[in-house]
Curated annotation (Swiss-Prot):
Main location: mitochondrion
Subunit structure of this chain's protein: The cytochrome bc1 complex contains 11 subunits: 3 respiratory subunits (MT-CYB, CYC1 and UQCRFS1), 2 core proteins (UQCRC1 and UQCRC2) and 6 low-molecular weight proteins (UQCRH/QCR6, UQCRB/QCR7, UQCRQ/QCR8, UQCR10/QCR9, UQCR11/QCR10 and a cleavage product of UQCRFS1). This cytochrome bc1 complex then forms a dimer.
Free-text remark on how the cofactor is bound: Binds 2 heme b groups non-covalently.
Protein family according to the UniProt entry: Belongs to the cytochrome b family.
Protein name listed in UniProt: Cytochrome b
Organism the protein comes from: Marmota broweri (Alaska marmot)
Localization annotation: Mitochondrion inner membrane
One GO cellular component term: mitochondrial inner membrane
Residue sites binding heme b b562 per the record: 83, 182
MF terms (GO), sorted A to Z: metal ion binding; ubiquinol-cytochrome-c reductase activity
Needed cofactors: heme b
Other comments on record: Heme 1 (or BL or b562) is low-potential and absorbs at about 562 nm, and heme 2 (or BH or b566) is high-potential and absorbs at about 566 nm.
Length: 379
C-alpha cells in the first residue's frame, strides 16, 4: 500500500518539498540559511502578532504602549526584544544567504534569484516601517528623513511624499498606515517565500562545486532535516543570548526618548542592517543621485545572472574571483561602519571610495576577472 504522505493531495506537496525532496549530498552549512530565514520569519510573525495585541498606533500613546508591553504584559519584555533582535538575526541570515548565492553562483537560477531580490526589498521595507512604530526620536526622524527622499522624484516628488505622510509632516496618519503595512507585509513575504521555493524546486538546489548533482542526490529527510534543526537550535541560542544579556546592543539609545518634532537628534541613522545602503546614499552630494544609488545598490543584485561571464558556475575553483568576492565583503563592512559615522572628513571620503568600489566590483571587476580566469584555463 502506498504511503499516505505520497498520495494525500495536501501532504504530498509537503512531502515533495521537505521529506522526499532529492538534495545534493555535498551541500554545506551555507545551505542552512534558507531554513533559518523561514524560522526567523515565523518568529517575527508570532512575536509581532502578540505585540500587535497590546500596541496602539497613535502618536499620543504609541511610545507609552511599548513601555506598557515591557512593564505590564506577561513576558512582554521578552516578546518585544525577541521581535527587535529577531529582525537583526533575520538580516544576518539574509546577508549570508545572498552572499552564499553570489559565491556559489546560485544566481544562475534567475527566477529563484529575482524573487529573492524582491523578497529582500520587501523585508527591508517591513523592517523600516517596524522601526517607526515605537515612536521614539530615531523612529520619527528616521521616518522623516527616509520618506523625504521620495521628494527627489521629478515633478511628482512633493505630492508623493505628502501622500505617503497623509499630511504635511510625519504624524498620526503616517504612524497608522505604517502599522497597517508592517502588519500585512510579512504575510505577503510568506507568500513570496512559497513562490521562491516553487521556482527552487523546479531546478533543484545548487551545490558548492557548481556542478550538476543529479547522479548524487539524497533524500532531504532525515539528512538535512537534522542538519537544519542543528542550525535552528544555534540560531535560537544566539538570539536568546542577545535578548537576555544585551537586548539593546544593536538598538539606538535615542529611541528611548519620545518623538519630538522640535528637537533633531545629533546624528540620524537607521538600524545597523541599513547602514551600508545609507552610506551609499550619503556618498553622493546630489539628492536624486543618492536615492538612485540607494535603490540600485540592492537592485544591482538582479544583474548578477547577466554579468556571469565565467565558464564555471561556482567560485570554488576560481581563486582570483574569490579574492575579489572577499574584497567586496570587506567593502560592505566598511560601508556599514561609515553609515554609522557623522558626515565629516575623513568618513565622507572613505564612504565615497567604498561606494565606488562596491559598484565597480560588481559591474566591472568581477566580470573582467571571470574572463581572465577563462583565458588562464584556455577556455
Amino acid at each position: 500500500m502506498t504511503n499516505t504522505r505520497k498520495i494525500h493531495p495536501l501532504i504530498k506537496i509537503i512531502n515533495h518539498s521537505f521529506i522526499d525532496l532529492p538534495a545534493p549530498s555535498n551541500i554545506s552549512t551555507w545551505w542552512n540559511f534558507g531554513s533559518l530565514l523561514g524560522l526567523c520569519l515565523a518568529i517575527q510573525i508570532f512575536t509581532g502578532l502578540f505585540l500587535a495585541m497590546h500596541y496602539t498606533s497613535d502618536t499620543m500613546t504609541a511610545f507609552s504602549s511599548v513601555a506598557h508591553i515591557c512593564r505590564d504584559v506577561n513576558y512582554g519584555w521578552l516578546i518585544r526584544y525577541m521581535h527587535a533582535n529577531g529582525a537583526s538575526m533575520f538580516f544576518i541570515c539574509l546577508f549570508l544567504h545572498v552572499g552564499r548565492g553570489m559565491y556559489y553562483g546560485s544566481y544562475t537560477y534567475s527566477e529563484t534569484w529575482n524573487i529573492g531580490v524582491i523578497l529582500l526589498f520587501a523585508v527591508m521595507a517591513t523592517a523600516f516601517m517596524g522601526y517607526v512604530l515605537p515612536w521614539g526620536q530615531m523612529s520619527f526622524w528616521g521616518a522623516t528623513v527616509i520618506t523625504n527622499l521620495l521628494s527627489a522624484t521629478p515633478y511628482i516628488g512633493t505630492t508623493l511624499v505628502e501622500w505617503i505622510w497623509g499630511g504635511f509632516s510625519v504624524d498620526k496618519a503616517t504612524l497608522t498606515r505604517f502599522f497597517a503595512f508592517h502588519f500585512v507585509l510579512p504575510f505577503i513575504i510568506a507568500a513570496l517565500v512559497m513562490v521562491h521555493l516553487l521556482f527552487l524546486h523546479e531546478t533543484g538546489s545548487n551545490n558548492p562545486s557548481g556542478l550538476i548533482s543529479d547522479s548524487d542526490k539524497i533524500p532531504f529527510h532525515p539528512y538535512f532535516t537534522i542538519k537544519d534543526i542543528l542550525g535552528a537550535v544555534l540560531l535560537i541560542l544566539i538570539l536568546m543570548i542577545l535578548v537576555l544579556f544585551s537586548p539593546d546592543l544593536l538598538g539606538d539609545p535615542d529611541n528611548y526618548t519620545p518623538a519630538n518634532p522640535l528637537n533633531t537628534p545629533f546624528h540620524i541613522k537607521p538600524e545597523w542592517y541599513f547602514l551600508f545602503a545609507y552610506a551609499i546614499l550619503r556618498s553622493i552630494p546630489n539628492k536624486l543621485g543618492g536615492v538612485l544609488a540607494l535603490i540600485f545598490s540592492i537592485l544591482i543584485l538582479m544583474l548578477f545572472p547577466l554579468l556571469h561571464l565565467s565558464k564555471q558556475r561556482s567560485m570554488m575553483f576560481r581563486p582570483l574571483s574569490q579574492c575579489v568576492f572577499w574584497i567586496l565583503v570587506a567593502d560592505l563592512i566598511t560601508l556599514t561602519w561609515i553609515g554609522g559615522q557623522s558626515t565629516e572628513y575623513p568618513y565622507n571620503i572613505i564612504g565615497q571610495l567604498a561606494s565606488i568600489l562596491y559598484f565597480a566590483i560588481i559591474l566591472l571587476i568581477l566580470p573582467t576577472i571571470s574572463l581572465i580566469e577563462n583565458k588562464l584555463l584556455k577556455w
